[in-house]
Structures are given as C-alpha cells and as structure tokens.
Amino acid sequence: MAELPIDLDEGLRQRLSRIVDIEGKIPRALEALGPVAGRDVLVLDGAEGIRAQQLRDLGARVAFANARGPAGEVVFDAPAASADVVISLWSSFRGAAPEEIAEARRVLRPGGRLLVVHDYGRDDVSHLRGALPEYGPWSKRGGPFLRDGFKVRVVHCFWTFESIEDGVAFLAAAFADAGRAVASALKRPRLSYNVAIYHRTFDGASAPEPSGSAP
C-alpha cells in the first residue's frame, strides 16, 4: 500500500509519515464517503501500517490485496463480492483504467463503494513535484474520473513540521533544489496539501452518495 504520496528513502519516509495530515482529515473523509466503520474494507497494494491502523481505529475490518498480477496484469487478488469498500491510496487507479474499474466491480458487493485517493494540487506541496496529471487533467469534468461516474471530495490538509527550521531541513534533504525553493517561502511550519478522493457506488446503492466538491 502507498502509505504516503511520495516514495522516499526510509529515513526520510519515516519523517514524512510524521508530517502528513497529522490532523487525520484523510481517514475522516474516507469514513464520511464510505463509510468504513463496521464494513469489510479491501485496501489495494495493502500492508500493515499507518493507514491500515487508521481504518481499524474507525471500525473497519481491513483486508489487503495486490492490484496487479505477477506479469503486471490488472487483477485484484481478492474473491468476487468480498468487500463493501475498496480503497486505493495513491498507487492504483492512475487514470481510472477500465480494467481497474471492472476489477473493483467484481470484488465489491452490491452497493459497494470505491474510494480512490490521489493528490489534487493547487497547494504548496505540488511545487515540490513538477507537473503531474493528478494536478490537472484527472480532476477536470472531462477527465478520466468525473466522466466515468465518479464524484470528487477535496480534502484540505497540511504537512506540519515541528518548526520552520525543521521544515527547511526536511525539504532540502528530501527534494533538493525544489525543496529549498519551497522552503525559502515558509512563513510558518507547514505546507498546504490538497487531496482528492474520487468516489463512486457500484450496483444497487441503497442510499444517495455523499456530496463532493468538483473544480
């Protein structure tokens, strides 16, 4: 499972895990859009860690599945109709490929929910990473998610540092020149960080979908 939106060396990764969304807005949004409490939740590319524990703390029964087979083919390693909610955290559904949608439909029970987390951009963190499709095309009304029946909820989070000095040191170590450029503009020990949760229901939902916000 992609515990974090960015893959860093282990030491920096541990530091990043203590920085991203310390307020817990992302798991609360997953509960609001699922819900996940008291339900069978399948996390793609799963492993024990921060996100799995956050889901369990909300009352989810968490299971994991690989999103791809040994040859790289799209196949979720889970039985048909085995989950109430499927969650992808940054790693899968990079553009909502039809094969992934079909696999989500297969493993979800009627009325099941698919929640796909990606970065949204329009924030401080996006300046660290350059141009990415999740920062523009994916969230457009004509993009791969919204044109295929998804709604989007934008969650306004932060990367929060212990101090401005701590932020400057981390950003330089993790992101080199781009990090130093962002750090030079720090006025307080945090960066704005926006996350998109694309969500949809499959087959026979018994209640209306939660409202989302679209750009």
Describe the predicted segments one by one.
Residues 17-39:
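Conserved alpha-helix/loop element of class I SAM-dependent methyltransferases that forms part
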Residues 74-86:
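A short acidic, Gly/Pro-enriched loop at the edge of an enzyme's catalytic core
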Residues 145-146, 151-215:
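Conserved Class I S-adenosyl-L-methionine
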Residues 93-104:
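A short, conserved alpha-helix within the catalytic core of class I
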Residues 36-48, 113-144:
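Conserved class I S-adenosyl-L-methionine
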Residues 63-77:
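Adenosine-cofactor binding site in Rossmann-like domains, unifying the SAM/SAH pocket
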Residues 48-60:
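Conserved SAM-binding loop of SAM-dependent methyltransferases across substrates and taxa
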